[in-house]
């Protein structure tokens, strides 16, 4: 059985190395218009290279390229629309609608993909937070009930933590 990445490549999507497509829906019909860089994670989101809103009236759907750079994370429930470029080192927050180009080194959220900070600042902030918060080195699916109980208490007190 082919992986999601292999299926996308077979449909013409250009995909780099170290790409995770976690329940992501990639526009297979227009895969040749989509490029995904290296070190990209797309979680439970949709990437579209077409817009069929014109099809009934005009007999044609609008199409456009989608270019996703390197070192990009696209959060749960996001929608990437046609004719956009997402730069390098970008975090697209959960539920974001990307309908315009996103520059390098930013974090965007919301229905208008509002820039709320830089990728570098976000990573630095979390790197420092890891020194204060619980960090679990046991994969979530391998934790025992006792490990979950301990982690829950620590995460509740520290208002967050980190897991593999």
Language model features by range: what are they?
Residues 64, 94-97, 107:
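Hydrophobic alpha-helical segments of small multi-pass membrane proteins
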Residues 112-115:
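Conserved switch/coupling elements of ABC/ABC-like ATPase nucleotide-binding domains
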Residues 1-71, 78-80, 88, 104, ...:
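Domain-scale signature associated with acetyltransferase and cell-envelope carbohydrate enzymes
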